[in-house]
Design a protein with these regions (language model features):
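Glycine-rich phosphate-binding loops that contact phosphosugars or nucleotide phosphates
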Residues: 1-115
């Protein structure tokens, strides 16, 4: 799908998630997705509730290594690993909430505003 001339994509296809997880392991599935789809001037949005997910940390490290633009949105603990490691993020937002309901709503509002 294109939006303002930019490709918009997210890894939500169960068959793609299964294939990437089986072939590369779940911790690297999303990182491999980036290998397939990221182009010049891509913006990767890294969202993690706990901020400790190895698969999201691998995506962040991939973005750092490839100098791909990325932003971070985490919740729960403010001193989470993703937030700490994200040195070159265009933004690094933390939502101070322990409620998954609030978190899901904020993620949805954020994505609606950005995408």
């Amino acid at each position: 799908m294109k939006f303002h001339g930019k490709k918009v994509s997210m890894l939500s296809d169960p068959s793609m998630i299964t294939m990437l997880s089986n072939d590369f392991g779940y911790d690297h599935a999303y990182e491999r997705f980036l290998d397939y789809y990221v182009e010049k001037d891509t913006l990767v949005i890294i969202m993690s509730s706990g901020g400790e997910s190895p698969n999201m940390l691998n995506c962040l490290n991939w973005c750092e290594e490839t100098k791909t633009n990325y932003g971070v949105l985490t919740v729960f603990k403010s001193d989470n690993k993703i937030r700490t490691v994200a040195k070159n993020a265009l933004w690094n937002y933390h939502i101070d909430s322990d409620s998954y309901g609030v978190v899901e709503c904020v993620h949805q509002i954020f994505l609606h505003g950005v995408v």
